[in-house]
UniProtKB/Swiss-Prot annotation:
Organism domain of life: Bacteria
Keyword ATP-binding: yes
Keywords on record: ATP-binding, Chaperone, Coiled coil, Cytoplasm, Nucleotide-binding, Repeat, Stress response
Residues noted as binding ATP 1 in the record, renumbered to the chain: 209-216
Location in the cell: Cytoplasm
Entry-linked PROSITE patterns: CLP_R, CLPAB_1, CLPAB_2
Protein name as catalogued: Chaperone protein ClpB
Organism of derivation: Bacillus cereus (strain ATCC 10987 / NRS 248)
Region NBD1, annotated ranges: 162-343
Ranges for domain Clp R: 3-149
Stored SUPFAM superfamilies: Double Clp-N motif (SSF81923), P-loop containing nucleoside triphosphate hydrolases (SSF52540)
GO biological processes: cellular response to heat; protein refolding
This protein's domain notes: The Clp repeat (R) domain probably functions as a substrate-discriminating domain, recruiting aggregated proteins to the ClpB hexamer and/or stabilizing bound proteins. The NBD2 domain is responsible for oligomerization, whereas the NBD1 domain stabilizes the hexamer probably in an ATP-dependent manner. The movement of the coiled-coil domain is essential for ClpB ability to rescue proteins from an aggregated state, probably by pulling apart large aggregated proteins, which are bound between the coiled-coils motifs of adjacent ClpB subunits in the functional hexamer.
Family stated for the protein in its record: Belongs to the ClpA/ClpB family.
Length: 866
């Protein structure tokens, strides 16, 4: 036989048969080797044809394997290595296969011709085929359903058989099988798609919209309507095939192979005479798909059929990709009719989630509260700004359900703690068993008593946990069964099988519903007892997931955090001394935000801190970050002195297209995208170029900035603090005797501020806070704070440091300058106190666990160790 007259798959099967014979130490390749290799290929044509005939493939394969084992094997010195003979039976089989190819007017001998030749085989294979009722007639019948009226004109024809099943999914069949979730709403878009599909020409809708708004769901909704026959007469009995472009392209090694596959798909659709609607998700992938030098891409192959109306195609793609790929090819674009899929509102999303609720409950085996559904829609809309409804809300519910599900499957915390304690005591028991002294024996007895008690508790808890798990799984299984029966009822009613419908509606379904109700009531009764497992998804779980995703504290305040927030003003005052007004205004803004009564479309608070250097402006921002997030690292600090040139503005929001660094994003916008809940400190704003403030206007008013990539960055959960030294000279000179700022000084400072910044900028700031110069008493408090920080650094060596009143007076006198604030004081303590301590520590005069007193003698600071 000429191998060139065989298809690639037949050649591969013969080669595999040779390898099989060698592995079994056979001297010849026979028909049974070839049969076994054809059955070995899972996705092969032989397997597909036998599946159509309802043949048990595994049993047939075992039968063939049994025949192979009967063959004599030759090993040892008598075996001729590398020599294989083809039996006369196999040669005759291939000759018969050639005749079958001629009968079917095919150019090459394909796998189906070999199978037809097997049906005329005598001996063991004939008996095997008879056992499985495989005859030439029923084989030909199955072959026609797989192959249709195609001829074998190439060496790889198997790739073009059942092309749609191989390279696509039947959405209507999936709906019937209950694999697709229900589609709620979207009626106007589905109606528009139906109208376009009912046109004579250009009947190809393309769904365009943002990612996650439900474009694919609209097509699934159409498939559900087709199943329910809730479509016009022209669309009844249609089927929707979702084309998998990646499967089409994958493995197409040679030129023309991709085109051959796609042509096979298109021919099947053409032959269906409009019965098949082709759905291409990510439509932009057809532009350039399979394009190599001199070849056509998928888009150009589709155009003629689209224009003639031979191909009903539904596309779906995002706005950006439609603009980038489809609009650039006007000939392709004009063949599609646009259907814009808008993002649903929060109310619509709540309806969608209510429709999906039962599917999630069945899948995860949990109960979802309606409050959780409302929370998922509202919180995702407010806090997750870079994604779209309903996708982000569905993800929240799904993850919250998964969290509860993993808790159900994992060991409860209480039981885990008891089990670990038992393990710990068992280790101790083994160790004490080796000791012979009286004390160890007494401890062993006590330990064994405790161990037996704990084991009893653990076994009780384990039994309770298993029972609770069993109850939850029982409810889940009943729900799944009920859903299956409802699907069967729908199918029976659709097929007018009234007997089956009556049996389901009045017999099986009420019985399962009754059983489910009893199981749920039992579960509700058990819930009143102290349960180990929880199966409810509430708004707290949703809020936890939002907090985990975004870092924004959305969950209800726990007691510790509530106390911390109420004491926020006091906490800030401990670190920022002498600036009561500033501390009060900032803490009030944070309280309003956490109580949920702030304007949701503006930042938590925006402040301008004015005052001389070293009075606590930057320190307050750091303290706020530390108090809210337990870390000063959560503060986004931008030194505005770096933005003195006009072009430096682009560094905040990213370079415009065409400039170096366009892909990198802006320093401010990228930082906030990663930490949406943070304190933003714009230090020394008067140093920045006036153009910078134009960018800040939207941030202060609407809580958002659009960066150079066109992404909207959300500032609604940030505290914006801007510091400036404007008017500090007036503040230094204009103090009352009680330390407050004179009214005329305040007016002078505000006048200078208005002269430097535009009214539209100042008008958007919540509060302009004047920091007053520090008085001597406040400076003493700062000295205490500096010493406390020093003690913190020495805490691991258990060394305490104390300054006498005289030493404090001396430090204040020598180190404080009203013009420079508290910073010189810190430097003075560093130079005079810390240096002396360091010298004594290195000399080992001060040892661990010492108490150090700093005093004044002969007009200088001295260190005494006690």
């Amino acid at each position: 036989m000429d191998l060139n007259q065989m298809t690639t798959k037949t050649q591969e099967a013969i080669m595999s048969a040779q390898s099989l014979a060698v592995s079994h130490h056979h001297q010849e390749v026979d028909t049974v080797h070839l049969l076994f290799t054809l059955l070995e290929e899972q996705d092969g044509l032989a397997v597909r044809i036998f599946q159509k005939m309802n043949v048990d493939i595994e049993a047939l394969k075992q039968g063939a394997e049994g025949l192979i084992k009967k063959k004599p094997s030759v090993t040892g010195s008598g075996a001729e290595a590398g020599k294989l003979y083809i039996t006369g039976a196999l040669q005759q089989l291939l000759v018969r296969a050639g005749k079958e190819a001629e009968k079917l007017q095919d150019d090459y001998i394909s796998v189906e011709h070999v199978l037809l030749a097997f049906t005329e085989e005598k001996g063991d294979i004939n008996q095997l085929f008879t056992r499985f009722h495989i005859t030439k007639d029923n084989l030909l019948q199955s072959l026609m359903t797989v192959r249709g009226n195609q001829r074998v004109t190439s060496q790889n024809p198997e790739a073009t058989y059942e092309a749609l099943e191989k390279y696509g999914r039947d959405l209507v069949a999936e709906v019937r099988a209950g694999k697709i979730d229900p589609v709620i709403g979207r009626d106007s878009e589905i109606r528009r798609v139906i109208r376009i599909l009912s046109r004579k020409t250009k009947n190809n809708p393309v769904l365009i919209g943002e990612p996650g708004v439900g474009k694919t769901a609209i097509v699934e909704g159409l498939a559900q309507r087709i199943v329910k026959k809730d479509v016009p007469e022209g669309l009844k009995d249609r089927t929707i095939f979702a084309l998998d472009m990646s499967a089409l392209v994958a493995g197409a090694k040679f030129r023309g192979e991709f085109e051959e596959r796609l042509q096979a798909v298109l021919n099947e659709i053409k032959k269906s005479e409009g019965r098949i609607l082709l759905f291409i998700d990510e439509l932009h992938t057809i532009v350039g798909a399979g394009k190599t030098e001199g070849a056509m891409d998928a888009g150009n192959m589709l155009k003629p059929m689209l224009a003639r109306g031979e191909l009903h195609c539904i596309g779906a793609t995002t706005l950006d990709e439609y603009r980038k790929y489809i609009e650039k090819d006007p000939a392709l674009e004009r063949r599609f009719q646009q259907v814009l899929a808008e993002e649903p509102t929060v109310e619509d999303t709540i309806s969608i989630l209510r429709g999906l609720k039962e599917r999630f409950e069945i899948y995860h085996g949990v109960n979802i509260h309606d409050r959780a559904i409302v929370a998922a829609s509202v919180l995702s809309d407010r806090y997750i700004s870079d994604r779209f409804l309903p996708d982000k809300a569905i993800d929240l519910v799904d993850e919250a359900c998964a969290t509860i599900r993993t808790e159900i499957d994992s060991m409860p915390t209480e039981l885990d703690e008891v089990t670990r304690r038992i393990m710990q005591l068992e280790i101790e028991e083994a160790a004490l068993g080796k000791e012979k002294d009286f004390g160890s024996q007494e401890r062993l007895k006590t330990l064994q008593r405790e161990l037996s008690d704990l084991k009893e508790v653990a076994s009780g808890m384990r039994a309770k946990w298993e029972k609770e798990k069993e109850d939850i799984h029982k409810v889940r299984d009943l729900r799944e069964h009920l859903e299956r029966l409802r699907r069967e009822l729908e199918e029976a009613e659709g097929n007018y099988d009234l007997n089956k419908a009556a049996e389901l509606r009045h017999g099986k379904i009420p019985a399962i519903e009754k059983e489910l109700k009893e199981a749920e009531e039992m579960g509700a009764h058990n819930k009143q007892e102290n349960r180990l497992l929880r199966e409810e998804v509430s708004e707290e779980e949703i809020a936890d997931i939002v907090s985990r995703w975004t870092g924004i504290p959305v969950a209800k305040l726990v007691e510790g955090e509530r106390e911390k927030l109420l004491r926020l003003e006091q906490i800030l005052s401990e670190r920022v001394i002498g600036q009561e007004e500033a501390v009060s205004l900032v803490s009030d803004a944070v309280l309003r935000a956490r109580a949920g009564i702030k304007d949701p479309n503006r930042p938590i608070g925006s402040f301008i801190f004015l005052g001389p250097t070293g009075v606590g402006k930057t320190e307050l921002a750091k303290t706020l970050a530390q108090s809210l997030f337990d870390s000063e690292e959560q503060m986004i600090r931008i030194d505005m002195s770096e933005y003195m040139e006009k072009h430096a503005v682009s560094r905040l929001i990213g370079a415009p297209p065409g400039y170096v660094g366009y892909e990198e994003g802006g320093q401010l916008t990228e930082a906030v995208r990663r930490k949406p809940y943070s304190v933003i400190l714009l230090d020394e704003i008067e140093k920045a170029h006036p153009e910078v403030f134009n960018i800040l206007l939207q941030m202060l008013d609407d809580g958002r900035i659009t960066d150079s990539q066109g992404r909207t960055v959300d500032f609604k959960n940030t505290v914006i603090i801007m510091t400036s030294n404007i008017g500090s000279a007036h503040l230094l000179d204009g103090l009352e005797d009680d330390g407050s700022i004179k009214e005329e000084s305040r007016e002078l400072v505000m006048g200078q501020l208005r002269g430097h910044f535009r009214p539209e900028f100042l008008n958007r700031v919540d509060e302009i806070i004047l920091f007053k110069p520090l008085t001597t008493n406040e400076i003493k408090g700062i000295v205490d704070k500096i010493v406390k920080e020093l003690q913190g650094r020495l805490a691991d060596r258990h060394i305490t440091v104390e300054l006498t009143d005289a030493a404090k007076e001396f430090v204040v006198e020598a180190g404080f300058d009203p013009m420079y604030g508290a910073r010189p004081l810190k430097r003075y303590v560093q130079r005079q106190v810390e240096t002396k301590l360091a010298r004594e520590l290195i000399a080992s005069t001060i040892t661990d666990n010492s108490h150090v007193v700093v005093d004044v003698e002969n007009n200088e600071l001295v260190v005494h160790v006690k």
